[in-house]
């Protein structure tokens, strides 16, 4: 069996992985001005960097919003498109080794996919994600560079901008510890520092995603949430999601290659869809 290439094609960023003998090899990401340039650039670079010949590639599996722009096989290699939500679930399950979970795909917005064995269902989403973080940062901090915003946030203090339970109550409320957020940005002042604003923006996005994922699990017995997508790489995830775990009695997991899970899932879909 040759190499199966999984490609997650975004509007400007493409993520690509290879799958051979059940193992993920050398994931990379490429950013370009448009999805076609990004896709072909990523594919060419992947083959070049890993010394892979065209005849070693058995199949290319595409997913993501940018895949709609692709109308033919990639460089003459057999190419198939697969559903993005299915790819999210397959990749998250493969990397986390968790069979029953809500897959939280944190992209420009955020989608929720229930994965229970081979039963995969898209159960909803919210318009909060990386696009929100970039847009608010552009307005409030004059930058949309997520790495820069994250670095600023590491120097900030969320207590300077967010209202906590301890600010409005002399004792914890039922199920709510003193450090739980009562209102996001409710304490922000006109002279709030860039660092505190950055901390507030990131906390708002991650807390909202975390709380929404818990609501998505309401009425089910699912207590595991697998976080995938670029935002899962933010160092603030390691601070915010453990607090939400205690608050809601759930478990958040960030697997290896969390940024590439959708591309991995696309490659895995080759066998699931009976193409092999």
Q: Can you say where each PLM-predicted feature lies in the sequence?
A:
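Short beta-strand-loop/turn "lid" adjacent to the catalytic site in phosphate-handling enzymes
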Residues: 29-32, 43, 48-84, 94-95, ...
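Short glycine-rich, Thr/Ser-proximal phosphate-binding strand/loop in the N-terminal lobe
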Residues: 3-41, 120
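Conserved phosphate-binding catalytic cores of ATP/NTP-utilizing and phosphoryl-transfer enzymes
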Residues: 70, 75-104, 109-119, 264-272
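Glycine-rich phosphate-binding loops at beta-strand->alpha-helix junctions
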Residues: 62-68, 215-244, 259
């Amino acid at each position: 069996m040759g190499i199966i290439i999984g490609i997650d094609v975004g509007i400007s960023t493409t993520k690509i992985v290879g799958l051979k003998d059940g193992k993920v090899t050398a994931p990379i990401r490429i950013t370009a001005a448009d999805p076609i340039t990004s896709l072909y650039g990523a594919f060419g670079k992947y083959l070049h960097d890993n010394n892979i010949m065209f005849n070693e590639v058995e199949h290319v599996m595409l997913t993501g919003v940018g895949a709609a722009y692709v109308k033919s096989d990639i460089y003459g290699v057999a190419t198939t498109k697969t559903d993005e939500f299915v790819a999210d679930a397959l990749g998250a399950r493969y990397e986390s080794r968790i069979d029953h979970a809500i897959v939280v795909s944190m992209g420009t917005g955020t989608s929720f996919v229930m994965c229970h064995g081979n039963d995969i269902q898209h159960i909803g989403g919210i318009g909060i994600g990386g696009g929100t973080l970039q847009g608010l940062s552009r307005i409030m901090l004059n930058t949309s560079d997520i790495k820069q915003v994250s670095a600023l946030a590491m120097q900030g203090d969320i207590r300077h901008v967010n209202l906590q339970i301890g600010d409005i109550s002399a004792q914890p409320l039922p199920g709510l510890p003193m450090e739980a957020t009562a209102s996001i940005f409710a304490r922000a002042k006109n002279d709030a520092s860039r660092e505190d604003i950055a901390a507030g923006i990131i906390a708002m996005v991650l807390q909202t995603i975390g709380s929404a994922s818990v609501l998505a699990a309401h009425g089910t017995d699912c207590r595991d949430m697998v976080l995938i997508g670029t935002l899962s790489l933010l160092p603030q995830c390691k601070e915010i999601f453990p607090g939400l775990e205690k608050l809601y009695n759930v478990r958040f997991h960030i697997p290896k290659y969390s940024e590439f899970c959708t591309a991995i899932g696309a490659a895995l879909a080759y066998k699931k869809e009976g193409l092999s």
